[in-house]
Swiss-Prot record:
It holds the Pfam family Acyltransferase. Pathway: Phospholipid metabolism; CDP-diacylglycerol biosynthesis; CDP-diacylglycerol from sn-glycerol 3-phosphate: step 2/3. One of its GO terms (molecular function) is 1-acylglycerol-3-phosphate O-acyltransferase activity. A motif (HXXXXD motif) lies at residues 96-101. The HXXXXD motif is essential for acyltransferase activity and may constitute the binding site for the phosphate moiety of the glycerol-3-phosphate. PANTHER family: 1-ACYL-SN-GLYCEROL-3-PHOSPHATE ACYLTRANSFERASE DELTA, 1-ACYLGLYCEROL-3-PHOSPHATE ACYLTRANSFERASE-RELATED. Its main location: endoplasmic reticulum. Keywords: Acyltransferase, Endoplasmic reticulum, Lipid biosynthesis, Lipid metabolism, Membrane, Phospholipid biosynthesis, Phospholipid metabolism, Transferase, Transmembrane, Transmembrane helix. This is 1-acyl-sn-glycerol-3-phosphate acyltransferase delta.
Length: 378
């Protein structure tokens, strides 16, 4: 292991990242809370401010992926569609197989300048996760319980609120509903067989109702669906902890731009369209597993410096008083003070580890693991 790799995996570096992320995140959450006063007076100003505050948080994680770990992402896409990316609102349909697929989605949004305003259809429990979840609440993310009887009205209402959103955004949706595992895949294919649908090898059966209501609610506001199929070279199994340790991954992302006019309006036809889309995604993944490449022209969108600039800003603001505080505590020589200091940072480290654990496959939700007879209907 070289010196740089050793440094990146050192606990002190992780402590610095965690400290900057937690403290800056809580400061930003506090500012976001104060901006609620603007909502009844000027809703659009509230949204623009929170869009930029959101960027200050989410871009720190993108910085870890792009600058700290140096992960490379090659996009395969139609050169005629490429100039439109970032200049229009889009629904991004991404496969859900890797622990950092959400981070790759954020990186895609960042490369095209729409990270701050981008949205996601997320499970409601994430709204209670400090910093990220609270940030999402203030930026009008769409939360769901994944029980359609409860979500039918609330999800539609949340989506309709985005029709006059003042910033460009990608609306990221994992139509599979949960991250891919072999157990979930086996159960999902039992459902596919029962419904007379073709089996998928690399994906779970997509949940069509959430996608249909998203398309219906955002039609004439969103210009296209971006069908995104993600994979990693050499059978890499990326993790958020690996990114924090500075491990470099090599991502390939196939992006197809599909005008929203081509997506049927009727729910049944929209469901059939989505099933066909996932059969095509499965074929692309199968081709990638055989050849190591996707169709279309490969392109690497340039990294923007703003994620790094943002992190350096917060680090310069927060690290000086932090180290002054540490030096003063050590100089005091008080055992009780030092013990309290160690305890606080142990708890903070465990909190960050818990947030990382939310992304881990082996600790993912049980959604999709129930018996096929007990699964909610599409």
């Amino acid at each position: 292991m070289d010196l740089v790799a050793l440094l990146k995996s050192h606990f002190l570096c992780h402590l610095i990242f965690c400290y900057v992320f937690i403290v800056s995140g809580l400061i930003i959450n506090t500012i976001q809370l104060c901006t609620l006063l603007l909502w009844p007076v000027n809703k659009q100003l509230f949204r623009k401010i929170n869009c930029r505050l959101s960027y200050c948080v989410s871009s720190q994680l993108v910085m870890l992926l792009e600058w700290w770990s140096g992960t490379e992402c090659v996009i395969y896409t139609d050169p005629r569609a490429y100039p439109k990316y970032g200049k229009e609102n889009a629904i991004v349909v991404l496969n859900h197989k890797f622990e950092i697929d959400f981070l790759c989605g954020w990186s895609l949004a960042e490369r095209f300048g729409v990270l701050g305003g981008s949205k996601v259809l997320a499970k409601k429990e994430l709204a209670y996760v400090p910093i990220i979840g609270w940030m999402w609440y203030f930026t009008e993310m769409v939360f769901c319980t994944r029980k359609w009887e409860q979500d039918r009205k609330t999800v539609s209402e949340s989506l309709l609120h985005l029709r006059d959103y003042p910033e460009k955004y990608f609306f990221l949706i994992h139509c599979e509903g949960t991250r891919f595992t072999e157990k979930k895949h086996q159960i999902s294919m039992q459902v596919a067989q029962a419904k007379g649908l073709p089996s998928l090898k690399h994906h779970l059966l997509p949940r069509t109702k959430g996608f249909a209501v998203t398309v219906r609610s955002l039609r004439n506001v969103v210009s296209a669906v971006y069908d995104c199929t993600l994979n990693f070279r050499n059978n890499e199994n990326p993790t958020l902890l690996g990114v924090l340790n500075g491990k470099k991954y090599h991502a390939d992302l196939y992006v197809r731009r599909i005008p929203l006019e081509e997506v049927p309006e009727e729910e049944d036809k929209c469901a059939a369209w989505l099933h066909k889309l996932y059969q095509e995604k499965d074929a692309f993944q199968e081709e990638y597993s055989r050849t190591g490449t996707f169709p279309e022209t490969p392109v690497v969108p340039p990294r923007r410096p703003w994620t790094l600039v943002n992190w350096l800003f917060w680090a310069s603001m927060l690290l000086y008083p932090f180290f002054r505080f540490v030096i003063n505590m050590v100089s005091s020589g008080s055992s009780l003070t030092l013990a309290s200091f160690v305890l606080v940072f142990f708890v903070a480290s465990m909190g960050v580890r818990w947030m990382i654990g939310v992304t881990e496959i082996d600790k993912g939700s049980a959604y999709g693991n129930m018996d096929s007879k007990q699964k909610h209907s599409d």
